[in-house]
Amino acid sequence: MELDQLSVVIVTFRSEDKINSCLGSIPTNIPVILVENSNNVDFKKKIENQYPNVECILTGENNGYAVANNIGLGKVKTKYALVLNPDAIIKKDTIENFLKITDQYNDFWLIGPVNNQANKDIIDRPETFEVNDLKGFAIFFNLVKFKGSYFDENFFFIF
């Protein structure tokens, strides 16, 4: 899979102190849709000026994680989307690893990485395996497989 088939969606709510590290870790040739759950026009201008690959959408109010992600995913024009938390940092090989998996398993719906444990030990699982749930900090969507909404908007989640 080529990078032009991937977009990143990030939901924020007053995350100015965290978002720069996240955005700085994303390759600049990947489009990013940042959905800010507020009406902070200054934040939007600053982000879009600093990161030309980022489109910042202001919701006007805090609609929650599910609604905001659905707004962002609805704007994606690529086949795949990576939903990412604003405090997540993409390591150098993360995108490439996702792309390798899409080449191997082109019939997938969702893919998620194994994250660091609370004690900061890194879990290295180079093989793929099925799980019952995914951690929400980074979810890789095959948008071709989804029909309808992505997140259940009855759940506000954390934001």
Residue ranges and their predicted role:
Residues A138-G148:
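Conserved nucleotide-sugar donor-binding
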Residues G148-F159:
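Donor nucleotide-sugar recognition loop
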Residues T59-V76:
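Glycine-rich, basic loop-to-helix element that forms the pyrophosphate-binding segment
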Residues I30-N39, I57-T59:
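Short beta-strand/loop segment that forms part of the nucleotide-sugar
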Residues S25, E36-K45:
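A conserved acidic beta->alpha catalytic loop
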Residues T12-T28:
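Short, well-formed alpha-helical segments that are part of the catalytic scaffolds
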Residues A81:
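Short aromatic/hydrophobic "clamp" motif used to bind/position activated sugar donors
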